[in-house]
Amino acid sequence: MARNLKSMMLCGFGLLCFLMIVDRAYAREFTVGGATGWTVPSGSQVYSQWAEQSRFQIGDSLLFVYQSNQDSVLQVTRDAYDSCNTDSPTAKFADGKTSVTLNHSGPYYFISGNKDNCKKNEKLVVIVMADRSGNKNTASSPPSPAPAPSGESAPSPPVSGTFEMTPAPTPTTSEDTPNSAASSLSFVAALLGAALASTLFLH
């Protein structure tokens, strides 16, 4: 009886680990700004429109690509975002290829470490949804719009039951691809789970 209980516990633990890894495999990596990357944008709404095109969820990550000798990325509070205050960031990155994992729901605020660049709208806010059910944007749950840069008013949300999205310029390549490392991990986990199950059943 004790042996059966131990086998059941091992199977349960293996299944739990497998499910956690499979959920992680659905995480996506978004290259900020698409092919253009993290730089002073050509217009005041470029990063807002980029953020509105995607639905960010817990476990996803943002990839900032930039010239490390000319720019950096600061994660900041909303007040610092609004005022382009670079003095006290919550996190600072300057490696030229920064990946930031979105590990909780709610807003994330990013600005350029170069204050002049931030004032030229090199700043980004993304809203992370808590749900990872696989449902994409629907009329019943439209994505939250990113706030407009300071000095500009944000468009009002639609009043009716349907919503309209203003077409935004699309990047030349789609950069929101599944995390390949996580996909590999899920495959390895499946193999380990099968090996564990066969070992338990053979004994």
UniProtKB/Swiss-Prot annotation:
The record's statement on gene disruption is: Slight alteration of vegetative growth and reduced overall reproductive potential characterized by delayed bolting and lower number of siliques reduced in size.
Q: Which residues form the signal peptide?
A: 1-27
Q: Which Gene3D superfamilies match?
A: Cupredoxins - blue copper proteins
Q: List the disulfide bonds.
A: 84-118
Q: What ranges does the record give for the region Disordered, renumbered to this chain?
A: 134-181
Q: Which residues form the propeptide?
A: 181-203
An example Gene Ontology molecular-function term: electron transfer activity
This protein's membrane topology, according to the annotation, is: Lipid-anchor; GPI-anchor
Which keywords appear in this protein's UniProt record, sorted alphabetically?
Cell membrane, Disulfide bond, Glycoprotein, GPI-anchor, Lipoprotein, Membrane, Signal
Residues glycosylated per entry: 103
InterPro entries for this protein: Cupredoxin, ENL_dom, Phytocyanin-like, Phytocyanin_dom
Summary of the tissues where the protein is detected: Specifically observed at the plasma membrane of sieve elements in vascular tissues of leaves, stems, roots, flowers and reproductive organs. Absent from companion cells.
Q: Where in the cell is it found?
A: Cell membrane
GO CC aspect terms: plasma membrane; side of membrane
Domain named Phytocyanin: which ranges? Answer: 28-130
Pfam families, A to Z? Cu_bind_like
What is the predominant subcellular site recorded for this chain?
Answer: membrane
Entry annotated with the keyword Transmembrane helix: no
Q: Where is the lipid attached (GPI-anchor amidated serine)?
A: 180
Functional summary from the UniProt entry: May act as a carbohydrate transporter. Mainly required for reproductive functions.
Q: Which family does it belong to?
A: Belongs to the early nodulin-like (ENODL) family.
For this entry, the protein name equals Early nodulin-like protein 9
